[in-house]
Curated annotation (Swiss-Prot):
Listed Pfam families: RNA_pol_Rpb1_1, RNA_pol_Rpb1_2, RNA_pol_Rpb1_3, RNA_pol_Rpb1_4, RNA_pol_Rpb1_5
EC number: 2.7.7.6
Alphabetized SMART domains for the sequence: RPOLA_N (SM00663)
Xref: HAMAP family: RNApol_bact_RpoC
Keywords: DNA-directed RNA polymerase, Magnesium, Metal-binding, Nucleotidyltransferase, Transcription, Transferase, Zinc
Cofactor: Mg(2+); Zn(2+)
Summary of the function given for this chain in its UniProt record: DNA-dependent RNA polymerase catalyzes the transcription of DNA into RNA using the four ribonucleoside triphosphates as substrates.
Cofactor note: Binds 1 Mg(2+) ion per subunit. Binds 2 Zn(2+) ions per subunit.
GO terms of biological process kind: DNA-templated transcription
Protein name, UniProt field: DNA-directed RNA polymerase subunit beta'
UniProt key word Signal: no
Family to which this protein belongs: Belongs to the RNA polymerase beta' chain family.
Chain positions recorded as Mg(2+) binding sites: D460, D462, D464
Length: 1400
């Protein structure tokens, strides 16, 4: 019987498939799906509950209501399988066919499909080249359209109103035909010759010169081509037959009380059938035209509502006033088919419960309540009971389990042994949100979680819940164990740092254990080893913190794995010596011979992992945790109010600050400072006071005076509980202690501006009512922010995953020589991120040479690991080219060499690793930690005064980069170029500092001069931009007429006069076209030339420039001719945090972007218009390029200056699109990576650059064809980059001309929608638009990405699935050639080995 059922089930097995194609269905196709026509709108008989014949639930069409039983009951049981009952016409089969048998409705008049009509751009409108409004008028019976002009002067597809039509009828009679409604459109579409249209448009493209026309024609041509290639017939966009959904997918269920609950679709179908039947009857009766027309219009509207309710006109509403859910609504949105049922499903064998701590567990274990385990492992228990012969049937086994007999618990123990379970905590923001553990049965009802995995789950025990899932098959258990076990996930995939790091209590315990104290019992003892140290401590002969000498044995393991031991006496403490007992062999003692804070412990685990491998590290981590908990308990650290010591200096500091504020207030009242300055100064005073109080408080807390053995007083670190917690990194920070014992300081209003009266009290002293009220402001804003942040961050992650989901490592090496240049991140005087940290885990793209020589230090294609990093440090390498995902040459996905090290595993990435999803998770997961707000500059944020000099922080050599300068009479260098940089390098040639040099800076050091730390290297004026002469001579003013182009002012106090150039807009008419300038002449009055050029030294003065020198004065080289006051920089809001990251990945253009030079050449200015300046760049070839620039933009270039392509002409935030166009892929990658990192670094979040590069690769996956060559592409068409690459490769192989193209940068939302796979795009956003487009162009989805495969229910082509898919393709290739003798054994171990090389 069982076999028979299985056989029946197997009958409808579909063959394996490799791609899914979507297209338009022809009427015949719809009829071929159908099992009969639905003729009546009836559903079921309300008395008998039987479906009506020919109705929407008809059993004859859709199949029986009960398994193997016809409707009238004549045939029952399996033996009549396949019989069709002659009485009621129902086939005897399973009920479930009612889920897949469709019906159809023959429409009495054709109806346009609303998706192809209204989904923009309207496909029908575009194809026929008629505006949508006109087509709608025809469809909804307001106008006639000419379908056959005959011998008349009418044109085909010309619109006629009712009157015009009647006039023409009188004139021509039946010479011509004009119709209205969908039949007219159908006729027109049917009479179109696609090939002829395409030919005609191609000719049009070649002859036309207008850009708009070309764009329009290209669009239409693409659509026509799509129809030709896909074999879709345009007529099929008009429906003549309507398919009917299987009834079980639109159920009708009787509720008690004689009412029915029904799917909205049934209502919509009933409307269509009613109107269709009425129309048929009207046509039979030959009713008047106007009635028929009205009925046809209503039919069109009802079909529209069925397909996509609310797309046109008002949505049809049901009885309860809400719009009915149409077919389109069923699939789109969060509750639609895609996101609700296909991408995320609920699963059996899962449970959830509250979590509590399991401090005694091992890292790979979790505590599972017995009750839960019994329920989850039921099937396993049943089968065990049966095989043991303890229960005869499954039913008996069930009874035994329900009675909870003693034997059941023994069997549960056996079943659970080494059967991992998955624990998941929502929200699962990265892959460590689901990990596998071995269950340990416990009493109680809460799941116990190992404390060290809390960081990965971001879990705490304040009532969090977690879900448990049971992997059922052997394969699933194997994967859970080898890939998902918590012991295999020690490193974070985002940064490669350990994520199993002790926190809180454990840190505090270890910190307390490794601190030292002066002059306590046992100080100065000599001990023979850690064991004796422990003995001394246990017998109370020495205290835990006593400074002692201990004999220590270290093990050193060299690269070949040979170990040598070394014994020495070490100055240490009892606690550290005891801790040494649990440290595995192979680590140096120095690593624990220090006070261990959170950072040091993390480093300790990292070292252990890199040197000793996974197994030892895991055991060590557990030991650390047990030890930490034990000593945290022994330490007795607690928080008491007396631990918060308020520094006595606080009160004097506050008094002084109040005095200063009073002075400023007086200055303001007497008009010496403006309101804004007063506000900023007051805030500065309070900010610095707060810092000083905090310093005094920390100094007070952090040290105490004790008497040492010699009776002298000595300072030692304090054992104050609060200080210890903050210092160890267990809990709290200096900023929080400052609020407890210093002063709370300045508070912000919800809009981000700072309230100028600070809270001078702290929590120990207590706040008064006003202070309390002020502080609630910020706190409430914080909570509101958090809620918004979570949603925003989640949406960002979703977009990132969607754009990157199909990046999988597909091959070992793509063979490219490309790469990106790596340099250390240097800001001002600090190396923010060292080169070794950036290059770690990357593969070298070009041989790295030993600095200053031609010797190869690191050969090409080397994976940089910790050993190489050390070599780089020793040889002071300061730049290198590494391979990157962005430049990877693989056609699909990327290759292992370009990706480099798998951060979570520490070796070269495996093929099949889903690096795209990991990148998206790594960027999205910390999203909730980023801030939401735009920072307003004001108050504390602008405490840094405007920079006006560079002071060297390191000793070394000065280097100038792309700097032009002149030497003035004081022998100082004056910079006359824009994007100059000054760097200071150390004796090894490593860059230590990097500074921007503004135009007009005075340098006291030249190129290659030595400099010592603390010297001022350059200075400039902060608030003005000078104009500097590059030649000496006499001044002559040009066009500088007082009262017209300049206004003179004389200072009353000094008697000095200066002229200010008036803004062109504010000049009288006479001065509009004048261009005030200063020119330099020699003694004879001839123009002086700028050295090295043929250009006279003319300096044009922009509006607002101030000139302090007189006409005819003598000037020397490097003197300042005029000053342009700069708007004090940076009162713009800086977008920070999450919105900034989103802007970068969406590649949004900034409001006023920087203007970059489009070409290399010499700058001059042409004729100005009302609001714009004309910038002209003359290239070396003499070709000029012009660009209009708004007058209010501050330009960085002067007449006659030379610029390089991509140089900044006007300041502002740079647009990534411009960077890509002018400076290329590398520059844009670097820009996005640096800007994103900036935001994350501010929050102290570490993310590896390769994740950001992976996303950038996906943003760059489209390109625009500029020249088609011999390819199939159209110029101006946007094509997938990989497609162009493949096409060009084939063209080059045939010796034809390849297509030329420009890379495009798309934002992540756009890039997700522009993906090759329509299934993936449709499940992301704008489902209707995506599906319409895909259907018209007959798209084929090759199921390459992960998402498409999840949706169609196959193994994903990543991880173990990658090997499976490769295997399948190989087998199919074989099968096509002819079956080979030995069929490859599809064995799981082979798959696992092929897909993964785990460390274990």
């Amino acid at each position: 019987m069982k076999d028979l059922l299985n056989f029946l089930k197997a009958q409808h097995k579909t063959e394996e498939f490799d791609a899914i194609k979507i297209g338009l269905s022809s009427p015949d196709m719809i009829r071929s799906w159908s099992f009969g026509e639905v003729k009546k709108p009836e559903t079921i008989n309300y008395r008998t509950f039987k479906p009506e014949r020919d109705g929407l639930f008809c059993a004859r069409i859709f199949g029986p209501v009960k398994d193997y039983e016809c409707l009238c009951g004549k045939y029952k049981r399996l033996k009549h399988r396949g019989v069709i009952c002659e009485k009621c016409g129902v086939e005897v089969t399973q009920t479930k066919v009612r889920r897949d048998r469709m019906g159809h409705i023959e429409l009495a008049s054709p109806v346009a499909h609303i998706w192809f009509l209204k989904s923009l751009p309207s496909r029908i409108g575009l194809l026929m080249d008629i505006p949508l409004r006109d087509i709608e008028r025809v469809l909804y019976f307001e106008m006639y359209v000419v379908t056959e002009p005959g011998m008349t002067d009418l044109e085909k597809s010309q619109m006629l109103t009712e009157e015009e039509y009647l006039d023409r009828l009188e004139e021509w009679g039946d010479e011509f035909t004009a119709k209205m409604g969908a039949e007219a459109i159908k006729d027109l579409l049917g009479s179109m010759d696609m090939h002829a249209e395409a030919e005609q448009m191609r000719e049009e493209l070649e002859t036309t010169n207008s850009e708009t026309k070309r764009k329009k024609v290209t669009k239409r041509l693409k659509l026509v081509e799509a129809f030709i290639q896909s074999g879709n017939n345009p007529e099929w966009m008009i429906l003549t037959v309507l398919p009917v959904l299987p009834p079980d997918l639109r159920p009708l269920v009787p509720l008690d009380g004689g009412r029915f609950a029904t799917s909205d679709l049934n209502d919509l179908y009933r409307r269509v059938i009613n109107r269709n039947n009425r129309l048929k009857r009207l046509l039979e009766l030959a009713a008047p035209d106007i009635i028929v027309r009205n009925e046809k219009r209503m039919l069109q509207e009802s079909v529209d509502a069925l397909l996509d309710n609310g797309r046109r006109g008002r949505a049809i509403t049901g009885s309860n006033k809400r719009p009915l859910k149409s077919l389109a609504d069923m699939i789109k949105g969060k509750q639609g088919r895609f996101r609700q049922n296909l991408l995320g499903k609920r699963v059996d064998y899962s449970g959830r419960s509250v979590i509590t701590v399991g401090p005694y567990l091992r890292l790979h274990q979790c505590g599972l309540p017995k009750k839960m385990a019994l329920e989850l492992f039921k099937p396993f228990i049943y089968s065990k009971l049966e095989t043991r012969g303890l229960a005869t049937t499954i039913k008996a086994a069930k009874k035994m389990v329900e009675r909870e007999e003693a034997v059941v618990w023994d069997i549960l123990d056996e079943v659970i042994r080494e059967h991992p379970v998955l624990l998941n905590r929502a929200p699962t923001l990265h892959r460590l949100g689901i990990q596998a553990f071995e269950p340990v049965l416990i009493e109680g009802k809460a799941i116990q979680l190992h404390p060290l995995v809390c960081a990965a789950y971001n879990a705490d025990f304040d009532g969090d819940q977690m879900a448990v899932h049971v992997p059922l098959t052997l394969e699933a258990q194997l994967e859970a164990r080898t890939l998902m076990m918590s012991t295999n996930n020690i490193l974070s995939p985002a940064s490669g740092d350990p994520i199993i790091v002790p926190s809180q209590d454990v840190v505090l315990g270890l910190y307390y254990m490794t601190r030292d104290k002066i002059n306590v019992k046992g100080e100065g003892m000599y001990l023979s080893g850690p064991a004796e140290a422990e003995k001394a401590y246990r017998t109370k002969q020495a205290e835990l913190h006593a400074r002692v000498k201990v004999r220590i044995t270290e093990t050193v393991v060299d690269e070949d794995g040979n170990s040598t031991t070394e014994t020495k006496m070490v100055d240490t403490t009892i606690g550290r010596a005891m801790l040494w007992q649990i440290v595995p062999a192979g680590l140096p003692y120095s690593i624990v011979n220090q006070k261990l804070g959170k950072k040091q412990i993390s480093n300790l685990l990292n070292e252990a992992y890199r040197k000793l491998g996974l197994k030892d590290t895991v055991i060590f981590a557990d030991q650390i945790m047990y030890t930490g908990f034990a000593y945290a308990a022994l330490s007795g650290v607690s928080v008491g109010i007396d631990d918060m010591v308020v520094p006595p200096a606080k009160y004097t500091e506050i008094a002084e600050a109040e005095e200063e504020v009073r002075e400023i207030q007086e200055q303001y009242q007497s008009g010496l400072v403006t309101a804004g300055e007063r506000y900023n100064k007051v805030i500065d005073i309070w900010a610095s006071t707060n810092d000083r109080v905090a310093k005094a408080m920390m100094a007070n807390l952090s040290s105490e005076t004790v008497v040492n053995r010699d009776g002298e007083e000595e300072q030692q670190e304090s054992f104050n509980s609060i200080y210890m917690m903050a210092d160890s990194g267990a809990r709290g920070s200096a900023a929080q202690i400052r609020q407890l014992a210093g002063m709370r300081g300045l508070m912000a209003r919800p809009d981000g501006s700072i309230i100028e009266t600070p809270i001078t009290a702290n929590f120990k002293e207590g706040l008064n009512v006003l202070q309390y009220f002020i502080s609630t402001h910020g706190a409430r804003k914080g909570l509101a922010d958090t809620a918004l942040k979570t949603a925003n961050s989640g949406y960002l992650t979703r977009r990132l995953v969607d754009v990157a989901q199909d990046v999988v490592v597909t091959e070992h090496d793509c063979g490219t020589h490309e790469g990106v240049d790596m340099m250390p991140h240097i800001e001002g005087g600090d190396v923010k991120v060292a080169l070794t940290e950036l290059a770690l885990g990357r593969v070298v793209a070009e041989d790295v040479l030993k600095p200053g020589t031609e010797d190869v230090l690191i050969p090409r294609n080397t994976l940089i690991d910790e050993k190489w990093c050390q070599i780089m440090e020793e040889n002071s390498v300061d730049s290198m080219k590494v391979r990157s995902v962005v430049t990877c040459d693989s056609d699909f996905g990327c290759c292992a060499q370009c990706y480099g090290r798998d951060l979570a595993r520490g070796h070269l990435v495996n093929q099949g690793e889903a690096v795209g999803v990991i990148a998206a998770q790594s960027i999205g997961e910390p999203g909730t930690q980023l801030t939401m707000r735009t920072f307003h500059i004001g108050g504390a944020a602008s405490t840094a005064a405007a920079e006006n000099s560079i002071q060297a922080k390191t000793t070394g050599t000065v280097k100038l980069h792309n700097a032009k300068f002149v030497v003035n009479k004081d022998k100082k260098l004056v910079i006359t170029s824009r994007a100059s940089e000054l760097t200071i390098i150390d004796e090894f040639g490593r860059t230590k500092e990097k500074h921007k040099l503004p135009y007009g800076s005075m340098l006291s050091k030249g190129d290659n001069d030595a400099v010592t730390a603390g010297e001022v290297v350059a200075n400039w004026e902060a608030h003005t931009m000078p104009i500097i002469t590059e030649v000496a001579g006499r001044i002559q003013f040009v066009d500088m007429i007082d009262g017209v182009t300049v206004s003179r002012q004389t200072d009353d106090l000094t008697g000095l006069s200066s002229s200010e150039v008036t803004d062109p807009a504010a000049r009288p008419a006479a001065g509009k076209d004048m261009r005030p300038a200063i020119k330099l002449v020699d003694e004879q009055g001839n123009d002086v030339m700028i050295p090295g050029t043929e250009m006279p030294a003319h300096y044009f003065l922009p509006g607002k420039a101030i000139v302090n020198i007189e006409d005819g004065a003598e000037v020397g080289i490097g003197d300042t001719l005029s000053r342009i006051p700069q708007k004090s920089g940076g009162n713009k809001d800086i977008t920070g945090g999450l919105p900034r990251v989103a802007d970068l990945f969406e590649a949004r253009k900034p409001k006023e972007p920087a203007i970059l030079a489009e070409h290399t050449g010499t700058v001059s200015f042409g004729k100005e218009t009302k609001g714009k300046r004309r910038l002209v760049i003359t290239r070396d070839s003499g070709v000029t390029y012009e660009e209009m620039i708004p007058k209010h933009r501050q330009l960085n270039v002067f007449e006659g200056e030379r610029v390089e392509r991509g140089d900044v002409i006007a300041d502002g935030p740079e647009s990534p699109h411009d960077i890509l166009r002018l400076r290329g892929v590398h520059a844009v990658t670097q820009y996005i990576a640096n800007e994103v990192q900036e935001v994350y670094r501010l929050q102290g979040v570490k993310i590896n650059d390769k994740h950001i590069e992976t996303i950038v690769r996906q943003m760059l996956r489209k390109c625009t064809i500029t020249h088609a060559g011999d390819s199939e592409f159209l110029p101006g068409e946007q094509v997938e980059y990989s497609q162009v690459k493949i096409a060009n490769r084939n063209l080059e192989a045939e010796g034809k001309e390849p297509a030329r193209f420009e890379r495009e940068l798309l934002g992540i939302t756009k890039a997700s929608l522009a993906t090759e796979s329509f299934i993936s795009a449709a499940s992301f956003q704008e489902t209707t638009r995506v599906l319409t487009e895909a259907a018209v162009s007959g798209k084929r989805d090759d199921l390459r990405g992960l998402k498409e495969n999840v949706i169609v229910g196959r193994l994903i082509p990543a991880g173990t699935g990658f090997a499976y898919h490769q295997d399948r393709q190989a087998k199919r290739a074989e099968a096509q050639e002819g079956p080979s003798a030995e069929q490859a054994t599809d064995n799981l171990a082979a798959l696992l080995n092929a897909g993964f090389s785990s460390d274990e």
